[in-house]
Swiss-Prot record:
CDD domains: NAD_bind_Shikimate_DH. Signal peptide: none annotated. Homodimer. Belongs to the shikimate dehydrogenase family. Shikimate binds at S14, E15, S16, T61, N86, D101, Y213. NADP(+) binds at G125, S126, G127, G128, S129, L211, G234. This is Shikimate dehydrogenase (NADP(+)). Pathway: Metabolic intermediate biosynthesis; chorismate biosynthesis; chorismate from D-erythrose 4-phosphate and phosphoenolpyruvate: step 4/7. It comes from Clostridium botulinum (strain Loch Maree / Type A3). Keywords: Amino-acid biosynthesis, Aromatic amino acid biosynthesis, NADP, Oxidoreductase. Involved in the biosynthesis of the chorismate, which leads to the biosynthesis of aromatic amino acids. Catalyzes the reversible NADPH linked reduction of 3-dehydroshikimate (DHSA) to yield shikimate (SA).
Length: 258
């Protein structure tokens, strides 16, 4: 039996163990998935003991999607371009990083039959998830993409120079966007009573996507729905990225072994 899991901080709310373990059981895959709640100073120890603990692969979530890069031997496209990794394959002599969030986000839009070509898009946040969504939207030929951040100067170091980056306090014309994506933990399980922005008005047929999936309807999504937007939470993205990660681990674990 191989171990897989999720590393992050304050992540006991995660639905990933249920998704993965149900899939493993249904498909007779000899894996088990668990939560690894780690402080940053515990990551070194976790990495050094991967083989000892029979860990074949793991997912990475907030706040370590960029931190994990320093531990990897190879980073596979598009994770190398994004600069953030959420899935790691553990081989005998190296760690390989992938970004299955990228795939999960694109597949979730396809699931809801949303075509973002030429959409004017707003990304809330500037961390690893935001970078992933930015490159996914570019891949899908979205139109103008604007990023709002609490720290725009720091955010500008992470994105292409041509990207429009604003202070989150300065962007109040949200009715100009066709798609708004919240890539912050605000509104999620650890910040349920907060919203990253106020949606007093949204464009007709605007899509508001909150990558948080707990609660099912964040305060942001509730407000968006009240204003006539089509709303999506991060559940489908979570499921699709999980299946992509499982595929990578199975290819490595069952066929490759170690």
């Amino acid at each position: 039996m191989y171990t897989t899991g999720l590393i992050g901080k304050n992540i006991n709310y995660s639905e990933s163990p249920e998704i993965h373990n149900n899939y493993y059981k249904k498909n007779n895959i000899p894996f088990f998935y668990k939560i690894f709640n780690l402080n940053q100073d515990q990551i070194d120890y976790f990495i050094k003991n991967l083989h000892k603990n029979n860990i074949k692969g793991f997912n990475v979530t907030i706040p370590y999607k960029e931190t994990i890069l320093q531990y990897l031997n190879d980073i596979v496209y598009p994770a190398d371009k994004i600069g953030a990794v959420n899935t790691v394959v553990v081989q005998e002599d190296k760690l390989i990083g992938y970004n299955t969030d990228y795939i999960g986000f694109i597949k979730s839009l396809q699931y809801y039959n949303i075509q973002v070509k030429n959409f004017k898009c707003l990304i809330i946040g500037s961390g690893g998830s935001a970078k992933c969504i930015y490159y996914a939207l570019k891949e899908l030929n979205a139109g103008d993409i604007c990023i709002v951040s609490r720290n725009p100067e720091k955010a500008r170091l992470k994105f292409e120079k041509k990207v429009k980056i604003l202070n989150i306090k300065d962007e109040n014309k949200l009715d100009r966007y066709d798609l708004i994506v919240n890539c912050t933990p605000i509104g999620g399980p650890n910040f349920r009573e907060q919203k990253p922005v106020k949606l007093k008005e949204v464009k007709k047929n605007c899509v508001v996507y909150d990558l948080n999936y707990t609660p099912k309807r964040s305060k942001l999504l509730k407000e968006a729905k009240e204003n006539g937007a089509f709303i999506i939470n991060g559940e489908k993205m979570l499921i699709f990225q999980a299946y992509s990660a499982i595929g990578l681990w199975c290819l490595n674990g069952i066929k490759g072994g170690r």
